Amino acid sequence: MAKINREKFPIGKVFISLSAVGTMVGSYVADWNETHIHNPTWPPHAKFHNAQTMSMGAALSLATLYHLWKPGRSRESLDSAAIIASVYGLTQLSAVLYPGTASVDPPREDNWPQLKYTLPSLGLVLVGYLTERYRISRKR
């Protein structure tokens, strides 16, 4: 079995990638169903914003992966990838600040079920970013 060189293996980039893929897949898993995009009680404009949110999750994830894995590694690319990877989760958390918002539709309890995914995802980005920064700084 091949031994992994920890100094060369970009585990931090893998952590950020896991967060990005989770965002891309998770937004569709959570919203492509009868409670969201296929909800007959939702007006077309609400579905428009839901579709926009799913597409935004995919676009941010693809941009993250591009900046993370493109040739010519750099600290700037890592910084960009980490910021982009965090945008979806941070904006999701900010939704509570807007009037009349709820984390779920009635009759379900508004207990922010998204937090069990959003906080670990942001944690992966943070740990991945710090780990990769450390790895890059040791290579110099």
Predicted segments, located by residue:
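N-terminal signal-anchor transmembrane alpha helix
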Residues: 9-29
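Hydrophobic transmembrane helix segments
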Residues: 23-45
